Regions:
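Short, well-formed alpha-helical segments that are part of the catalytic scaffolds
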Residues: 11-26
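Short beta-strand-to-loop acidic/aromatic patch adjacent to the donor-nucleotide binding site
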Residues: 82-94
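Acidic/His-rich active-site region of diverse nucleotide-sugar glycosyltransferases
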Residues: 96-181
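A short, conserved alpha-helix in the catalytic core of glycosyltransferases
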Residues: 162-171, 175-213
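Non-catalytic, C-terminal membrane-associated alpha-helical segments of glycosyltransferases
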Residues: 231-235, 250-302
Length: 302
C-alpha cells in the first residue's frame, strides 16, 4: 500500500493550524504527501514548508485553480510507479485515523472501482453532508445521498454509482493515467466532480462510497472573503453551462439552463432586500453568459 495524498493551498494562513492537526491523523498511512501551492506569497510558502517539512512541495507560481493544482500533483504522482493509490484531500478536511487504509482496501476490493470515497459529515458532527451523490448522466443532475440525516440512518455499507465529492477521494493511478484522464483545467474551480462523473460513466468504470470511513468537511473559510463568494457564483454559473454543452444534448442543456435561471429568479425575488443575494445572482448570471459565449479564461479575480 503506497498512497500519495495531494492537497492544494493558496495563502491559507487561517487554515494552517487546523490543517496540520488533521494531517497528523493520516500522515503515517502515506507514502508521499504532495502539497501544491497556487501562487501564494513568499511568506506563506515559507510557513508552508515549515509546517510540512517532509512533504513534496510543488509551487506553480500562479493560480491554477482547483483543477490545475490537482493535475500538477497527479502528474507528479504518476511519475512514480511505486504509487498504487492517489488521494485528493482538502486542507480543511478531517478524516478518521486509519481511514485512508480502509479506503485503499475498499478501492482494490473490486476491479471495476476507479474512485472511492467516505461518508462526509458536517463540521464536528454526526450529521451527513453527503454519502456520495446520486447522478443522472442524461441531465447532469446530482443530489447528495442522506443529506442532513444522522449517520446512524445509513443502512448500506457501500453504494456504487453516482459520484464521489472531489475534496476527499481516492483513485487508482490508471484512473487518471489511461482510463478517464486528468481533470479539465478549463473549469478552474467547481464542477470537476460532475465532469469526472460523466467521463467515468462513458469509460465504464465505477465510483463508490463506503460508510465504514468517515470524514468531516470543516469549511474553514476566510470571513472577509466577499469577493471570493461572489466569484464563486460566477464560476458556478459559467461551469454549469460549460458542462451542459460538453456532455448533454442541446435539448437537455437548454432545459437545464432554463431551470437554473428560474430558480435564481425565485431566489432573488425572495431575498431581494439582501445586497449580497443580489450580487451573488448578478455574478451567477454573468458567469452563465460567459459559459454561453465560451469564455473560460476570466479566472483572474481569484
Amino acid at each position: 500500500m503506497k498512497i500519495a495524498a495531494i492537497t492544494l493551498t493558496r495563502n491559507d494562513d487561517f487554515r494552517l493550524v487546523p490543517w496540520k492537526m488533521y494531517f497528523q491523523d493520516y500522515k503515517d498511512e502515506l507514502y508521499e504527501h504532495i502539497v501544491v501551492d497556487n501562487g501564494s506569497t513568499p511568506e506563506y510558502q515559507r510557513k508552508l514548508r515549515e509546517a510540512f517539512p517532509d512533504s513534496t512541495h510543488i509551487e506553480l507560481g500562479y493560480n491554477g485553480g482547483c483543477t490545475g493544482a490537482y493535475n500538477a500533483g497527479i502528474r507528479h504522482a504518476l511519475q512514480d510507479s511505486e504509487i498504487d493509490a492517489i488521494m485528493l484531500i482538502g486542507n480543511d478536511v478531517k478524516i478518521e485515523r486509519g481511514g485512508l487504509t480502509k479506503l485503499f482496501v475498499f478501492l482494490y476490493s473490486n476491479n471495476n472501482n476507479g474512485m472511492v470515497g467516505p461518508v462526509i459529515l458536517k463540521k464536528d458532527s454526526t450529521e451527513v453532508a453527503c454519502f456520495g451523490m446520486s447522478f443522472n448522466p442524461d441531465t447532469g443532475i446530482a443530489l447528495p445521498r442522506y443529506a442532513h440525516k444522522p449517520v446512524t440512518e445509513i443502512q448500506e455499507r457501500t453504494i456504487e454509482g453516482g459520484y464521489v465529492p472531489g475534496g476527499v477521494c481516492m483513485a487508482k493511478p490508471e484512473f487518471y493515467g489511461s482510463i478517464v484522464g486528468l481533470q479539465d483545467e478549463a473549469l478552474f474551480l467547481y464542477g470537476d466532480e460532475r465532469d469526472m462523473a460523466h467521463r467515468i460513466y462513458k469509460a465504464g468504470v465505477k465510483e463508490a462510497v463506503t460508510s465504514e470511513v468517515r470524514a468531516w468537511h470543516q469549511h474553514i473559510n476566510d470571513n472577509g472573503a466577499t469577493n471570493y463568494i461572489r466569484f464563486s457564483s460566477y464560476l458556478q454559473g459559467r461551469n454549469h453551462v460549460y458542462l451542459d454543452k460538453k456532455h448533454l444534448t442541446r435539448r437537455r442543456a437548454f432545459a437545464g439552463l432554463c431551470k437554473r435561471i428560474l430558480f435564481k429568479m425565485l431566489y432573488l425575488a425572495r431575498y431581494f432586500y439582501k445586497y449580497e443575494a443580489r450580487m451573488n445572482v448578478s455574478y451567477y448570471i454573468k458567469g452563465t453568459f460567459a459559459g454561453l459565449k465560451g469564455n473560460m479564461d476570466n479566472n483572474i479575480q481569484f
